[in-house]
Amino acid sequence: MARHVFLTGPPGVGKTTLIQKATEVLKSSGMPVDGFYTEEVRQGGRRIGFDVVTLSGIRGPLSRIGSEPLPGKRECRVGQYVVDLTSFEQLALPVLRNAGASGRPGQSICVIDEVGKMELFSQPFIQAVRQVLSIPGTVVLGTIPVPKGKPLALVEEIRTRKDVKVFSVTKENRNHLLPEIVTHMQSSRK
């Protein structure tokens, strides 16, 4: 049976909301859960970027709408957003590196929301995700984008792993998926 669960679907369909709800249910049933999710940042009703938020409540910028790049400075951009790699790595990497640190098999769940274009500018993040997926005692609950344009190597690698179950989230099924996701996560730990 697939051990890890990844949600996929178009932007704004409710992947992060489902992750947050599943996390609450799993935590309240006594499972150790750690990780991070991404959240829109809005100003005056307009999206200006994304924050990365750890499950322990630490928040930092992932990206913001950018102005012109500074001369000579290499900038990581996705569309109009400039990615703050330093901030992202300071928050996400320690969480991923601590995954499975309890050392007891089947004892931890690691939330990775998301493995997407912005996050994949970070080579250490790519390595850390691969490592977490291979730790025997760790189950990953994550999100990946819908394939469009040029394939993202790590996303395709995750999508095709034998130990990963991918749920496609749609407006039609998003309100019914939670019990299935939670049940799968709980049975993956046994």
Curated annotation (Swiss-Prot):
It catalyses: a ribonucleoside 5'-triphosphate + H2O = a ribonucleoside 5'-diphosphate + phosphate + H(+); 5-methyl-UTP + H2O = 5-methyl-UDP + phosphate + H(+); CTP + H2O = CDP + phosphate + H(+); ATP + H2O = ADP + phosphate + H(+). Its EC number is 3.6.1.15. Keywords: Acetylation, ATP-binding, Hydrolase, Nucleotide-binding. Transmembrane segments: none annotated. ATP binds at residues 9-16, 109-116. The keyword Nucleotide-binding applies. The modification N6-acetyllysine is found at K165. SUPFAM superfamilies: P-loop containing nucleoside triphosphate hydrolases (SSF52540). The modification N-acetylalanine is found at A2. GO terms for molecular function: ATP binding; ATP hydrolysis activity; CTPase activity; GTPase activity; ribonucleoside triphosphate phosphatase activity. Pfam families: NTPase_1 (PF03266). InterPro entries: Nuc-triphosphatase_THEP1, P-loop_NTPase. PANTHER family: CANCER-RELATED NUCLEOSIDE-TRIPHOSPHATASE. NCBIfam families: PRK13695.1. Has nucleotide phosphatase activity towards ATP, GTP, CTP, TTP and UTP. Hydrolyzes nucleoside diphosphates with lower efficiency. Monomer. Belongs to the THEP1 NTPase family. This is Cancer-related nucleoside-triphosphatase homolog. It comes from Bos taurus.
